[in-house]
């Protein structure tokens, strides 16, 4: 969290949101099982209130900015999870739980709605994911840039990172 806050401070971010995910929620399960360790409840352990974050617990909670909603993304899965999210949520939505890249759109009378699975930024090597029995995963390194416009409209740009390299606004970025 310190690294995230440091970056957000550098870009003068004034609104910070934390949507709890399934891994974060493991701390809450431990506190339920062992109530004498309440300081390990997720939002307490990472000091979200002190850091100035608006907190959304794990589950069905959505945060909407304009006409785009965000949440962790673990409620609907399968091979076509972006289509499942769009069909079941019924709104434009972005999530990260599945760590891969998918996008699905549908046009209604009210306009186009889309769902995006935006990948991840973690080490995807089998060695770093021993908890998955060292199997290969269908994950992708990526992040999203979202531009918001008047009337709640927005555009989404998914920036995929291949072997530590990407191109953003005409500039090669390596890491």
Question: Can you annotate each of these PLM segments?
Answer:
Residues 49-65:
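Short acidic low-complexity segments
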């Amino acid at each position: 969290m310190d690294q995230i806050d440091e970056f957000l401070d550098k870009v003068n971010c004034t609104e910070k949101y934390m949507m709890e995910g399934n891994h974060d929620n493991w701390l809450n399960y431990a506190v339920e099982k062992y109530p004498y360790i309440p300081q390990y409840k997720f939002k307490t352990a990472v000091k979200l209130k002190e850091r100035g974050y608006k907190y959304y617990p794990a589950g069905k909670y959505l945060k909407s900015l304009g006409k785009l909603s965000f949440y962790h993304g673990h409620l609907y899965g399968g091979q076509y999870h972006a289509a499942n999210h769009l069909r079941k949520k019924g709104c434009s939505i972005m999530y990260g739980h599945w760590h891969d890249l998918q996008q699905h759109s549908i046009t209604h009378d009210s306009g186009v709605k889309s769902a995006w699975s935006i990948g991840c930024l973690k080490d995807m090597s089998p060695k770093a994911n021993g908890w998955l029995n060292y199997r290969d995963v269908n994950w992708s390194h990526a992040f999203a840039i979202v531009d918001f416009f008047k009337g709640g409209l927005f555009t989404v740009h998914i920036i995929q990172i291949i072997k530590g390299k990407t191109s953003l606004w005409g500039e090669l970025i390596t890491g």
